[in-house]
Amino acid sequence: MDLATDLAALLARWRIDGADMLPPSEPARVEAVFAQLGQPATPEVLTLYTTLGGMATMDNEFWRMWSLDEIAQANQGPPSEWGVLFSDFLIHSHVFRLRTTADGHSEVIADALPGAAAPVRVAATLAEFFALYRQNADQVLTPR
């Protein structure tokens, strides 16, 4: 799994599909936002946000990656043990978090809205998340 390759392929697909893509961020800005939220910007997070700055609109799968400004806004207050909110599916039917692992990766956690099921890990790394997303988005967007 190569995150940069999967992101490049998805970016091309999202542009063709008409998703409103935001410009990439500078590495220092990515590091600053994640540090402010009490979590390091892993190399995967840096690759993600220096390739794609987020989405202004959902893609054809009804998933939307948030901008760094939205991440900072959504993660105000005490840090969650489940990680940093970074995207949503189906207009917030559930949200996704990035949590740094002991080996320096960012695992992806699906977190339902309050009152719903407990959070579920959908991918051990961001590279795995986007590889699965590229093959069949439902694998990661609708965890069971």
List the model feature ranges, each with a label:
Residues A112-N136:
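Compact, glycine/acidic-enriched structural inserts
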Residues H94, A117, R134, L141-R144:
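A ubiquitous, low-specificity "background" feature that marks scattered single residues
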Residues M1-A102, V140-T142:
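A surface-exposed partner-binding patch
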Residues T100-G104, L126-E128:
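A short, sequence-level motif marking secondary-structure junctions
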Residues F96, I109, R121-A123, L141:
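N-terminal non-cleavable signal-anchor helices
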